Amino acid sequence: MKLILCTVLSLGIAAVCFAAPPKSVIRWCTISSPEEKKCNNLRDLTQQERISLTCVQKATYLDCIKAIANNEADAISLDGGQAFEAGLAPYKLKPIAAEVYEHTEGSTTSYYAVAVVKKGTEFTVNDLQGKTSCHTGLGRSAGWNIPIGTLLHRGAIEWEGIESGSVEQAVAKFFSASCVPGATIEQKLCRQCKGDPKTKCARNAPYSGYSGAFHCLKDGKGDVAFVKHTTVNENAPDQKDEYELLCLDGSRQPVDNYKTCNWARVAAHAVVARDDNKVEDIWSFLSKAQSDFGVDTKSDFHLFGPPGKKDPVLKDLLFKDSAIMLKRVPSLMDSQLYLGFEYYSAIQSMRKDQLTPSPRENRIQWCAVGKDEKSKCDRWSVVSNGDVECTVVDETKDCIIKIMKGEADAVALDGGLVYTAGVCGLVPVMAERYDDESQCSKTDERPASYFAVAVARKDSNVNWNNLKGKKSCHTAVGRTAGWVIPMGLIHNRTGTCNFDEYFSEGCAPGSPPNSRLCQLCQGSGGIPPEKCVASSHEKYFGYTGALRCLVEKGDVAFIQHSTVEENTGGKNKADWAKNLQMDDFELLCTDGRRANVMDYRECNLAEVPTHAVVVRPEKANKIRDLLERQEKRFGVNGSEKSKFMMFESQNKDLLFKDLTKCLFKVREGTTYKEFLGDKFYTVISSLKTCNPSDILQMCSFLEGK
């Protein structure tokens, strides 16, 4: 910091003065003179703020994306297709704030893309070839990118890539005629538009936008209109019963059923920026700007809108006129997660020059956590003749993210993580059963369960009522028996979320490295040490790891009811376990008593659902069928179990729990809430308000959209 020597003459004292730190500057990228003018007005109004604004004008959105990537500008608000482009290499920009819009259902940062048809016309999504179509505009999300990308992805529209001609040419061959404002090169795509022949296909023509595309359908110029879920209610609320939605499963549904009958969720426009230390300054500036100049403020300057402008050149400057506020995007979010799997896939399908070959439909991409799981998964892949392929990540949350992105298909998770995966849009399809093999062939109405228990050494004086200040051992943060249940009970009793202050020290893999709950952890013993990581690289990870932590360092372990039995009496040959006996341990009951390890039905913390395989909803049936085939070969009674055993890994619980007798089918359509049960869902929902993980924050943001 610059020092200035200044003299206070009246007192005759020399003093050292500190100059004010230099102001941070945000460089906003604009793409037109009206937008630059609005930006400069905002700049002038915020000159006295801690963070100031400058404006950088470029010719196009892509020029702005390049400028931000090259550190010549800092931010711009983009629509979904542009945000897709910005997220690709070499730009790698990320969304940091989302525009929020007011709809009849309330404020939201997304909408649904739907296909609207007149009731009584009877055709389905599978009969669109040869029909006439109405679109909001070329390159627009609900009107073009999603419907055309989806039809390409499904193979309905045939297109071999850019070398075979443009996407517009392929669409013109698919529909008999269309109105696609902006598609002036392809005549058939303008044939159904109305107005002056010279301007009827312009981007601001009568049939452009949501209302225009709907009126194209209403006027009989099209058989189907690709719009957003609110369009019919906004344009013909009294006639909505005359229209229906085309669903991707081949059915039709009423207009109000858009949540279950849509082609994709479309994310709002997002402010994108480089993933660097400027992000906080950008959000601080935007937060202050919307506080001073947002909706319902008394300022003459409007950050958003105002809506209802007649001149299209003056519409949507800096932000959409319909925006009512900006909402911070969680830091874990990239453009692919922000846009969502369906929308991202639709756009990818329109960029075949950049696509990798599609994977075979009859195989599964399993997500393995850490090198031990990767090793087992690779052996499974070999004996499965490639029906199972493997991708490896460092932490379980990364599996959830990969499945969300379509980069993996499945992973088996414990109940606490099934909750997180469920918030992230995944569904349970198969669940592990640990006791009764005779039930394996059934599809359970009620999921199988196990008991979460607290275990202490028999020779200690620990009980449930004196745990505060003791040393604790947990399977991992966020897992059911090792975290959710015990911490949920402690949270209910104490009201505190400061769990690392409740115990003197502990090992809860996945905790912050400097937390008390990492102090007992051992790591891998190698380089890097990987201490306190939530994978098998940490010696005290998982059920067996938590028991080992109790044996070597801790006062209490939070584990599953069968863990002690599985690792005592010579069943675990490892040095730390080979001499252990079941009678060395006791259960801690919540009434303060202690009990024999086998009395878990009467002395437990909770009965909880077993681990489950989670997938994206559209993959559920295929993965369920494939896993059934794999289990017939490599399960407990598999025909080829001499080659490989799915449920065996020397007490390490790799990929599945070693105790698993079989995988049973979760009833089709079961939600994660139904699978977890009301009691467990209530406990975990309450607990998750305490310091929610970054992935839960991200998925809660998406779920709230």
UniProtKB/Swiss-Prot annotation:
A single Gene Ontology CC term: extracellular space
CDD domains: PBP2_transferrin_C, PBP2_transferrin_N
Record protein name field: Ovotransferrin
Main location: secreted
Family: Belongs to the transferrin family.
First and last residue of the signal peptide: 1-19
Function of the protein: Transferrins are iron binding transport proteins which can bind two Fe(3+) ions in association with the binding of an anion, usually bicarbonate. Responsible for the transport of iron from sites of absorption and heme degradation to those of storage and utilization. There are two forms of hen transferrin, ovotransferrin, found in the ovoducts and, serum transferrin, secreted by the liver. Serum transferrin may also have a role in stimulating cell proliferation and is regulated by iron levels. Ovotransferrin has a bacteriostatic function and, is not controlled by iron levels.
Transferrin-like domain residues: 26-352, 364-689
